[in-house]
Regions:
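Short, hydrophobic/amphipathic alpha-helical packing segments
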Residues: 62, 66, 137-148, 225-230, ...
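Glycine-rich, mobile lid/loop segments that gate access to catalytic sites or pores
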Residues: 49-174
């Protein structure tokens, strides 16, 4: 929501949830009847959400688990699609977006059964070709429960301390309709987005920005700060606009690690902002930096 609003979009007109934006980032071609949801792989312990990331899975590990789930639970209506790390995609053909899902990072140490998907209160069916909100919620909850059995018995989890033992679908929507930044702001002729996160890349895709991927950009505290700022400077030499996104402090905050969050903010200041400012200060053409 915040990243879309920062770029100047009217959220009431364009926002469809994280799922459709992340689908664009991984080049999944959403169809008009698709419901796309973010699908976290999370860790449950003692019937509670222990964390929202399954012990910080790598993309390779996440892909292995998602492909296994798709083999066992996927069909013509249901697709599990690999994203990045613990962040993946669940597509339901004919699914209804008028449901209430709990973001797992907002509910650590809470009982998962109390957070299951619910139909949106007060919504009256208008799309006869789609499932009802209740049927959609029932299907998603069934997938959550089935995933727990499959993941608990997956060889990957049998000898791993942190258990990636449940899916958690949320933030679903339909294919969005967004103008490009160039259409919103004629002064911008070209631009790029730099991020390790599918959500931000997806926003950039719909905004008409080039998506720049940086080696070593992890979205965590160990990300390649220098590589990202170097890519931003190189893009600014050729283009009018660069959206540089650093995820590390957000992940540290969700983990409740104050020391790490402070360190990531220091890294942002000394390894990104300082380098960027010192470089562009020597340019003849003025550059505006907005730090948000």
């Amino acid at each position: 929501v915040a990243n879309t609003a920062i770029l100047g979009y009217d959220l009431n007109k364009v926002y469809e949830g994280r799922g459709p934006l992340e689908a664009a980032s991984i080049e999944y071609d959403m169809q008009p009847d698709d419901l796309a949801l973010r699908c976290n792989i999370i860790e449950l312990e003692d019937d509670c959400i222990k964390n929202h990331h399954g012990g910080h899975l790598t993309t390779e590990e996440g892909n292995m688990l998602i492909q296994s789930l798709n083999d066992k639970l996927g069909n013509e209506q249901i697709k599990f699609i690999t994203g990045i790390q613990y962040r993946h995609l669940l597509v339901i053909k004919g699914g209804n977006k008028h449901i209430t899902c709990a973001p797992p990072h907002d509910h650590p140490n809470e009982e998962w059964k109390s957070l299951l998907v619910q139909p949106e209160e007060g919504y009256h069916m208008k799309d006869d070709h789609r499932m009802s909100p209740q049927a959609t919620a029932n299907l998603l909850n069934e997938l959550i429960i089935k995933s727990q059995t499959l993941l608990a018995n997956h060889p990957f989890n049998l000898h791993r301390k942190a258990k990636a033992n449940s899916i958690w679908p949320w933030s679903g929507g339909y294919r969005p309709s967004m103008s490009t930044l160039m259409q919103l702001y004629p002064e911008i002729k070209s631009g790029s987005v730099i991020s390790a996160v599918d959500l931000i890349r997806g926003i950039g895709h719909y905004a008409g920005l080039d998506v720049i991927k940086v080696n070593g950009a992890t979205g965590l505290a160990d990300t390649n700060y220098e590589g990202k700022v170097k890519a931003a400077i190189e893009a600014l030499e050729k283009q009018d606009f660069v959206y540089l996104h650093i995820e590390a402090s957000d992940e540290a905050g969700h983990d409740g690690d104050l020391d790490l969050k402070l360190k990531t903010i220091e890294n942002l200041d000394t390894r990104v902002v300082k380098t960027l400012y010192e470089t562009i200060s020597n340019w003849q053409e003025p550059v505006c930096i907005a730090l948000l």
